[in-house]
Structures are given as C-alpha cells and as structure tokens.
C-alpha cells in the first residue's frame, strides 16, 4: 500500500463512521515518524506491512471512540507538541486564541514589566507553558486540583524548557493562603453544563476527564467561585482572562462587572464567530 492509498482508505472509512476524515493524516504522520510536509512529498512511497497494520489499528480504534491524541500521545498547541493522556483535556485551537488575547493585553496594559501570572486549571500545561515561553517577563504559576494532571504538565514543561511554578490546590487557594498577589489570572475552567455533557460525542464523554469539562448545572459554577476569590489575590492593576462556552459571554461579563465595577470587560468572539473569551482589564 502506498501513502496516498492509505490516506484515501482512512478518509473514506472515517467519513463513513462519522469521524473527522483528516484524522488519517495525523495518524499516518505518527506511524511513519514524519510531518505533514514529509507525508505530502512522499505520497507514492510504499509503506511496510507493519506500518500498514499499525495504521489500520489506530484508525479502527478511533472509529470505536478513542481520541487520536490519546493514542499517539501528543497534540500540537501554539506550534509546540504537548504530551497528553486521559488525565488531561486535549488542547483545543480556540485556546490558542485565548493566548493571543492575553499576550496582546499584557503588552498593552503592562509593557515589558515583570509580572506574576497564574493559570488556573493546569491540565496539560498548554496555557501556562506557552505563556512562559512566549514572554520571558512573566513569572508563571499554575494550579490544578488533580496531581495526575500536574505530572503531565511538569513533563511538558521539562521537555519544552519552560520555567513554571506548579501548585496542587483548588482554584486560587494557594495564593490567598500565602498572600501572593497576581497581575494576571488566566483560566479555561470547566464550563459545559451538566445536561450538555450528557449529549457530547462518546469520543469526548467517554475518554476526556469530566472534571475538566463540566461546570455545574448551567456551566457557570467555576466563574462564580472565581468572583469570590479574585479580589483577594489580584493587584490593583490587573488582567483577568477566561475561556468560556458558547452563549456564556454576557453571563460571565456580568459576573466580572459585579466583582470589579470599574473594570473594562470585553467579550471576544473566536475565529468561528462564537463568544469564546472574556477579558477584564482592572485599573
């Protein structure tokens, strides 16, 4: 079997079974230990019988519901490869837009000041590690309630050469317990309503950690808790940045305005035109 034949088969098989037809390309890159460019340049190359077997097994497992990223053990985020397993949420492209928004506002709000930044809900470390690598003026802390997630993120920080301080704890508790003040707080908290979670694709519901996805009956539980804790840990001049679920923009904006009446609060839409981020600039 040639490369192009393997891709053609996978695309058709995945489509027939309601999966993303592009997943075959990701899997074949992994099996052949190459990148997309290498794949495209060698479309007529023969793959070995062993590679073909491995490739078809991966594709069949994905059709059964296992996410590709957990099978191959990594996902690309902001141009870097992050190790992932079933203890952490798979990083999404939408969260890259959150990173862009945070970095832009830091530059506008603080210039090149040295800042204390916290990412709440570590997961794979995609947010905290990316911020630390993209802006060397940031002292980045990150907190997760699950030690298993922290271990994954620590491995990513070591592999990618990022300096991040890890805390095992619940939301902002490590900071108000120590009196540490923060200039920037970023979070992609669990925001899916309980009822919506029940209707998710089995690929997500049966494999990604529920604790990283569900935010109570209306999806807003964690944002409400943040509003109780943020005033205790923020500097007078600060930035708060949240990723949100579709349709939650005005609710989260309202919560932030209630907690910080003089802040400039903005709902930002993602590349698909959906409300996806809320930023508060506090003076």
UniProtKB/Swiss-Prot annotation:
Q: Which residues bind substrate?
A: 188-191
The reaction(s) catalysed by this protein are:
L-glutaminyl-[peptide chain release factor] + S-adenosyl-L-methionine = N(5)-methyl-L-glutaminyl-[peptide chain release factor] + S-adenosyl-L-homocysteine + H(+)
Query: Which Gene3D superfamilies does this UniProt record tie to the protein?
Result: DNA helicase RuvA subunit, C-terminal domain, Vaccinia Virus protein VP39
Q: What is this protein called?
A: Release factor glutamine methyltransferase
GO term, biological process aspect, one: methylation
Keyword Transferase assigned: yes
Q: What is its EC number?
A: 2.1.1.297
- Superkingdom as given in the UniProt entry: Bacteria
Query: SUPFAM superfamilies per the record?
Result: S-adenosyl-L-methionine-dependent methyltransferases
Q: Where does S-adenosyl-L-methionine bind?
A: 121-125, 144, 188
Family from the record:
Belongs to the protein N5-glutamine methyltransferase family. PrmC subfamily.
PANTHER family in alphabetical order: HEMK METHYLTRANSFERASE, MTRF1L RELEASE FACTOR GLUTAMINE METHYLTRANSFERASE
Lineage summary: Bacteria, Bacillati, Bacillota, Bacilli, Bacillales
Keyword terms of this UniProt record:
Methyltransferase, S-adenosyl-L-methionine, Transferase
